[in-house]
A protein has these predicted regions:
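Catalytic toxin/effector domains delivered as secreted proteins or via bacterial secretion systems
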Residues: 2-124
């Protein structure tokens, strides 16, 4: 019997690789009702390196009250086509405006600042 050759994986992904970022995470907290619907609606592609760095700095996004989530979901349904075409920063800003929970907004502000700084770095 011969030994199989193991495939070698890249330890660091190429800078052009994209990963799906759930703006509202972790899934175990955002797994039911309007929370799950909002989590699944707000997924945007981001570079893998940025995605890993963000998750190493911010471990979870707190789940707001169910009434706030329901109100935000109803607003999302009215403007779904427009919101789905938004980039990651615009989508985070939309969530920040429509869900007025203090802890949630703190996490959204952190993500917004993080992505804004990363996009500034790539422009130059």
């Amino acid at each position: 019997m011969s030994k199989k050759k193991r495939r070698r994986c890249r330890r660091t992904p190429p800078l052009t690789a994209k990963d799906r970022h759930h703006i509202c995470y972790q899934g175990r907290y955002w797994g039911s009702g309007y929370a799950k619907a909002i989590r699944n609606a707000f997924v945007r592609p981001v570079p893998v390196v940025w995605h890993r760095e963000l998750h190493s700095r911010l471990s979870t996004v707190p789940v707001p009250d169910g009434a706030l989530l329901k109100k935000a979901w109803v607003e999302y349904q009215k403007e779904a086509d427009i919101i789905d075409s938004m980039g990651v920063c615009q989508a985070i800003a939309w969530l920040y405006v429509h869900i007025p929970d203090v802890e949630f907004r703190r996490a959204m502000q952190f993500q917004l600042d993080f992505f804004a700084s990363k996009f500034e770095e790539t422009v130059y």
